Amino acid sequence: MAFGDYPAEYNPKVHGPYDPARFYGKADVPFGQVKLGEIGAWLGRRNKTPNAVAGAVSRAWWRWQHKYVFPKRAGIAPFFQLTVASMTFFYLINYTKLKHHRNYKYH
Amino acid sequence: MMTNLFSVFDPSAIFNFSLNWLSTFLGLLMIPSIYWLMPSRYNIMWNSILLTLHKEFKTLLGPSGHNGSTFIFISLFSLILFNNFMGLFPYIFTSTSHLTLTLSLALPLWLCFMLYGWINHTQHMFAHLVPQGTPAILMPFMVCIETISNIIRPGTLAVRLTANMIAGHLLLTLLGNTGPSMSYILVTFLLMAQIALLVLESAVAMIQSYVFAVLSTLYSSEVN
């Protein structure tokens, strides 16, 4: 599968027009229906190659845009969703530094 | 690691990788893309901003400006605006508070204008060293002053933006850090002051990106 190609599992004769929001690989139990004890095994079955991860992010982004950004009367929500997500991301990658801030009172 | 007032400007993140620079590209996620024929509110808003800027920069460039040369300044504006504005949210790194970024925007731009101007319009560039209406006795001094002012342009452009961003963030952190040792009544006032400052800084974020774009437009219109 080269860059920009359809996923290898996609077959236009079976699936019809290509939908960028859809996963064409072998269907697994949806995450919402996974029992707590099976989460480890479920995660173990995920395809974690860079290609697959990029594909998953791409599908999620597509779905998110269609739900929140593309509608004609889209509100301010997607902006704040992105902002909060970015804030969380930068908080997490800076946590090793930020955790020292609780010692400010001793400075 | 010792944290201090300036740790908000530290690009290094987990494992000492400079991952905080990633925030430079947050704007790419914010640009509304078009899918449906009918534009969404985001598209309408974004288009009207771009159109207004286009008209603004077109008049600044004057009749000698080439078609489409406003695009680079509009892109410059939006890049800086997204960086300035997103940097005001907690934990998000402000790339424009570093000369590394602002100077890498301003210096190549200025260098291109200079090379273009001096190679293609040498006479015109020399003429610019003496502004119209300068008394003859002041002309030698004006040449010196104009030369210096021309050479420091990339520096002033970059430092103006960086200093503004640093000043705003320092003010917010300094004031915010006094909170823990305050009484509850004073904290209410502190909160109000911080909100007012945040509004002010949002305005500064927009104004400074506009200033950067407008000045580079004017510099480009001077060389042809």
Curated annotation (Swiss-Prot), chain A:
Cellular localisation: Mitochondrion membrane
UniProt entry keywords in alphabetical sequence: ATP synthesis, CF(0), Hydrogen ion transport, Ion transport, Membrane, Mitochondrion, Transport
Q: Got a GO cellular component term for this one? A: mitochondrion
Which superkingdom? Eukaryota
Q: Which Pfam families match?
A: WRW (PF10206)
Q: Which InterPro entries match?
A: F1F0-ATPsyn_F_prd (IPR019344)
Subunit info here reads:
F-type ATPases have 2 components, CF(1) - the catalytic core - and CF(0) - the membrane proton channel. CF(0) seems to have nine subunits: a, b, c, d, e, f, g, F6 and 8 (or A6L).
PANTHER family, per database record: ATP SYNTHASE F CHAIN, MITOCHONDRIAL-RELATED (PTHR13080), ATP SYNTHASE SUBUNIT F, MITOCHONDRIAL-RELATED (PTHR13080:SF20)
Q: Give the similarity note.
A: Belongs to the ATPase F chain family.
Q: What does the UniProt record say this protein does? A: Mitochondrial membrane ATP synthase (F(1)F(0) ATP synthase or Complex V) produces ATP from ADP in the presence of a proton gradient across the membrane which is generated by electron transport complexes of the respiratory chain. F-type ATPases consist of two structural domains, F(1) - containing the extramembraneous catalytic core and F(0) - containing the membrane proton channel, linked together by a central stalk and a peripheral stalk. During catalysis, ATP synthesis in the catalytic domain of F(1) is coupled via a rotary mechanism of the central stalk subunits to proton translocation.
> What's this protein's name?
Putative ATP synthase subunit f, mitochondrial
Report the gene name: ATPsynF
Swiss-Prot record, chain B:
Give the UniProt family note.
Answer: Belongs to the ATPase A chain family.
What keywords is this UniProt entry annotated with? ATP synthesis, CF(0), Hydrogen ion transport, Ion transport, Membrane, Mitochondrion, Mitochondrion inner membrane, Transmembrane, Transmembrane helix, Transport
Q: What is this protein called?
A: ATP synthase subunit a
Query: Where's it mainly located?
Result: mitochondrion
Q: Where in the cell is it found?
A: Mitochondrion inner membrane
Q: Which InterPro entries match?
A: ATP_synth_F0_asu, ATP_synth_F0_asu_AS, ATP_synth_F0_asu_bact/mt, F0_ATP_A_sf
The biological processes this protein is annotated with in GO are: determination of adult lifespan; locomotion; muscle cell cellular homeostasis; neuron cellular homeostasis; proton motive force-driven ATP synthesis
Specify one Pfam family.
ATP-synt_A
Function as written in the Swiss-Prot or TrEMBL entry: Mitochondrial membrane ATP synthase (F(1)F(0) ATP synthase or Complex V) produces ATP from ADP in the presence of a proton gradient across the membrane which is generated by electron transport complexes of the respiratory chain. F-type ATPases consist of two structural domains, F(1) - containing the extramembraneous catalytic core and F(0) - containing the membrane proton channel, linked together by a central stalk and a peripheral stalk. During catalysis, ATP synthesis in the catalytic domain of F(1) is coupled via a rotary mechanism of the central stalk subunits to proton translocation.
Q: Name one GO molecular function term.
A: proton transmembrane transporter activity
Report the GO terms under cellular component: mitochondrial inner membrane; mitochondrion; proton-transporting ATP synthase complex
Under the heading SUPFAM superfamilies, the entry gives: F1F0 ATP synthase subunit A (SSF81336)
Query: Subunit arrangement?
Result: F-type ATPases have 2 components, CF(1) - the catalytic core - and CF(0) - the membrane proton channel. CF(1) has five subunits: alpha(3), beta(3), gamma(1), delta(1), epsilon(1). CF(0) has three main subunits: a, b and c.
Q: Which residues cross the membrane?
A: 17-37, 72-92, 99-119, 125-145, 166-186, 187-207
Q: Which residues form a coiled coil?
A: none
As for membrane topology, the entry says:
Multi-pass membrane protein
